[in-house]
A protein has these predicted regions:
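Surface-exposed interaction regions that form or flank ligand-binding interfaces
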Residues: 1-60, 67-72, 81-83, 92, ...
Length: 211
C-alpha cells in the first residue's frame, strides 16, 4: 500500500513538472540546440541558458547565443502552443488556446534588453550591427498575424541565419567573443534562477506602481 502511494506521488510530481514553465522552456531551448547541431556545423558555437548581470541591479537570462562567422545571433525561444497574435510595436502579444487568451511580453522587446547587455559586454570586440535578434516559437504554435522577419516557428529560423553569408567575424574573434561572454555568465543553479525570477517580479511591481 505504501509503495502504491509513493508511486502515485512520484507520478503527480512528474506530471506537474512536465506542465511547468521551466520544463517547457527547457524543451524550447533543446529544440534550438538540435537545429544548430544538425544545420550549422562546426563553424558556429552555441551558448545556452545564459544568466548575465545587467547594467543595473538585476540579471538578464538569454536562452541562446549563437556565435558564427556571419554575426552573433541572440535567440529567444517560446515553447507555446495555440494561436499567436502580435506585431513588432505591441508591448504585449496574445496566445489563444481554444476560447482562452493569455497575454505575454513582446519577445522582441524582451530580446532587445538581451541585445543591449551583450552590446555593452562586447563593445571593444564587436560592432553592434553584427548582433542579430531571433525569436523562435515551437511548431506547435500557429501565427495568426503577419510576423516580423526575425520571428519564426520551428527550424525556419535556420534559413534566416544562413541568409547572412558575409564573413564578418574571424575565428580568432569568435573565440574572444565566446570567452568574454563566458566570463560574464553566472554559474547556473537554482539560486541564480531564483534571483532572476525575483528580479523580474520586483521589476513588474515597480512598473505597476509607475503606471
Amino acid at each position: 500500500m505504501l509503495f502504491y502511494f509513493i508511486f502515485i506521488i512520484i507520478i503527480l510530481v512528474v506530471l506537474t513538472y512536465l506542465k511547468s514553465p521551466h520544463f517547457k522552456g527547457k524543451m524550447g531551448e533543446l529544440m534550438v540546440a538540435v537545429h544548430v547541431d544538425k544545420a550549422l556545423g562546426d563553424e558556429s558555437s552555441l551558448l545556452n541558458n545564459c544568466t548575465i548581470p545587467d547594467q543595473g541591479q538585476g540579471t538578464t537570462q538569454i536562452d541562446h547565443i549563437l556565435i558564427s562567422p556571419y554575426g552573433v545571433f541572440i535567440i529567444e525561444t517560446k515553447n507555446y502552443t495555440g494561436w499567436i497574435f502580435g506585431s513588432a510595436r505591441q508591448k504585449q502579444w496574445t496566445q489563444k488556446i481554444y476560447k482562452k487568451s493569455y497575454k505575454f511580453q513582446n519577445p522582441l522587446h524582451q530580446n532587445y534588453k538581451h541585445m543591449k547587455v551583450l552590446e555593452m559586454i562586447l563593445s571593444d570586440i564587436l560592432e553592434p550591427k553584427y548582433l542579430h535578434s531571433v525569436i523562435v516559437f515551437t511548431p506547435r504554435s500557429e501565427f495568426k498575424t503577419e510576423m516580423p522577419e526575425n520571428v519564426f516557428r520551428g527550424k525556419a529560423w535556420i534559413n534566416y541565419v544562413k541568409s547572412f553569408n558575409e564573413e564578418v567575424i574571424s575565428s580568432m574573434k569568435q573565440k574572444r567573443i565566446h570567452y568574454r561572454i563566458e566570463k560574464e555568465i553566472l554559474e547556473s543553479s537554482w539560486k541564480t534562477d531564483r534571483q532572476h525570477i525575483e528580479y523580474l517580479k520586483q521589476k513588474s511591481t515597480n512598473n505597476k506602481h509607475l503606471n
